[in-house]
Amino acid sequence: MKARNLWLIIPWTLFVAAALAWIFYWNYLAGEAERRVHAWQFEQNAGGTTVEIGQVVRHGFPVFLRLELRDVRYAASRGGWRAETARADLNIDPLKPRHAILEAKAPIAITRANGAVTNVSADALIASVRMNGADALAEAGVEADNLVLDDPAEEGVLHAAKVVATVRPDARAAGEYQFAFDAQTITLPRPVRSFEAFGLDVARLRALIVVTHGALVMQSSPGDPLGPWRDGGGRMRFEALELNWGPLQTTGTGEGGLDAQRRLDGRLVLPVERPAPVLTAIANGPRIDSDARRALSLLAAGYVVTGNDITLDIGAHDGVLRIEGLPVRPLPPVY
């Protein structure tokens, strides 16, 4: 064979070999992704949860890998709730197989134990998980554009132009996790009792939270899903809590958790520039102690006159909510 012909054949041979290798790799990765989906389904069903997937269809060759999951149904083993959707797509980058993206392609119906249904829809609703190694979480998150929550049995719908939530290990301390939540341009479905003057439009709700003993959150116990986390000393540290709603514009800090009776236990410190509307709304709320109602109303009237700002100290201890040290109302168990 002439050298000239050899130099023509070698590149084509390498190209064909690379193409065949990529075809093999893509199909191997697709098969492995399907296997993991079915393994997760089997594991959930074995634990009492019901997971049903009508059909898995492969798409995206040669550049992308997308598994179309049709007729997905998830019924939790505890809590009595279930979720259903006609389609969700699992996207995997063949060059980054440890990063998976799940995108809702149809509305999601969530049914609670009491039969109430919330329909979830969005222009884009994406959940992603990125792993370090085989089983170490690097980051997980959910992002939605024009999110709509509609409960057909209730008046109105909740709308948020943008919602982003992420969780990742906190590099500053082993066993702690950072949780971030940011919702912008929110429209509430209906007025909030005693806060009617604040309106339905919430410009922003943002939280930066550190969860201690985060791994214990996943160790649910029957009838007490957060029991292991609470008993293990789990707490939440609010490094920032921002709320821009009507006359209330604040960014505070605090910490909290649950007591042995599953009631809120902790403290928030919220700087408020215009405290009168906030104090008035709290005073007019349900189940407020009569003495606290009078004290809060007088305090609100004083701030109307002075126009001063305030740093609200809100505490929850021994089953009682306190504002500026005043016992305001009893606190029921969270669940």
Predicted regions and their residues:
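Extended terminal
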Residues: 2-13, 54-55, 224-235, 241-244, ...
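Alpha-helical transmembrane signal-anchor/signal-peptide segments
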Residues: 28-45
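N-terminal beta-strand/beta-hairpin edge segment
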Residues: 46-174
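Extended lipid/amphipathic-ligand handling interfaces
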Residues: 56-59, 85-95, 121-135, 158-174, ...
